[in-house]
Amino acid sequence: LSAIPDTPAAAGWRWAPAWVLAFVALWPAPGYAEAVMVLGALAAIARLLLLRFRGGMRLLSGPAWALTSVLFCSYWLPELLSAFDAVDRARALREAAVDLRYLPFLWLVAAAVADARGRRITFGGLGAIVALWTVDALAQALTGTSPLFWGIDGIKQALSGHPMCAVGEAARVDRLSGVLGPCNLKLGIVLASLSPFALYAAARRFGSVGWLLAAAAVGVVVLLAGARAAWLTYGLVLLLSGWRVLGWKRLLGVFVFGALALGLLAATVPQLRERLARTAYALSADQDGVDLALSGRTRIWGAALCMARAHPLNGVGARGFRDAFPACDPVPTQPAAWGTGPALHAHQIVLEILSETGVLGLLCWLAGVALAWRAWRYADAPARARARPALLALGVTVFPLNTHLAFYSTFWGGLTLLLAALYAGSLLARDSDPGAAAS
């Protein structure tokens, strides 16, 4: 499909990058981020209605519209199909209906990176957010306080009289929490998933030295944030972005330096040392040792397999894991490593999809992966260069040989869909921009 030339009618979408950056920047205040996303979705719908959909080609190329919509459907259709006989059918149907709000917002996200100006603002802005959050977390590591979270918490208390986090939650924190705060310990995995935007921006502006400095700063924060899934995610980012900037030999030196830095941090940070010691239990042949190393996840995965066997076609329903867990708990009489109450989700993308949406859901996800890869395979070199940061961020986020946050949750599902739309919009952009090549 050929794109209709740009006209002044499309100028209103110059604000699309601002919607995307505001959504991400407000993640420390989830309610406000959700409001920005909903308003962005409404703005997208209004814009399309005003143009009577004739302006669609001015905003996105035809293939970009199609790929963005298909990637959304590969996420949403499993949720819908699993709802009809879910453990809590009414809730599942309601959540599936509510999640339709993502589709117009994803069109807006893809439109934000549909031309060179939009990509420069959006990708550069995401890199700047990662840099700011990294500096803030390093300040917390040195002083014990996150300046950004301190400011957000002060505003919250001034407006509502209540802090962002309960006193007990703040007292129990055992890792770097940064701008997200002690009651939302996702800093490590969020920075790891978004780090390609910062690393590519640093390499493009300052060359290999910029990449090295950015990689070191983000790496220290990811380590101190304590999420071992984030360590693997960030390692993949370094591997897949670093070889293009440094070459294999120099990249090997980076990993050797990283191992030495890890040893130094472990010697000086008790919480990191404890996590490394717990991880070492995975080398034990004893199942209990492996379960301890994985913080009880083998028990959760056993329950997920039980759900998949009991509901093979369409699972127990998206977000229904916690309700179905007691019936599938392999050791219900033993105390759980995560504390009281049922496990909330499968902590692994394939098991989450199988247990909550069944084989039908897995086929939908695989179809989305296949179409995303097909688009990459047939894209030309400039298009691949444009989309490389978004593809890397999306790829490491859904990398199956890792543990994960819940993809059928508002926060992590929203982040994943955002990355998918950034990938589709930048790969199949309206322009042909060889100058966008990443380093």
Question: Where on the chain are the PLM-derived regions?
Answer:
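Alpha-helical transmembrane segments of multi-pass inner-membrane proteins
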Residues: 19-21, 43, 104, 120-246, ...
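Transmembrane signal-anchor hairpin modules in multi-pass inner-membrane enzymes, especially those
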Residues: 1-94, 111-124, 128, 153-154, ...
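Transmembrane alpha-helices of multi-pass inner-membrane enzymes
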Residues: 39-47, 238, 365-371, 390-402, ...
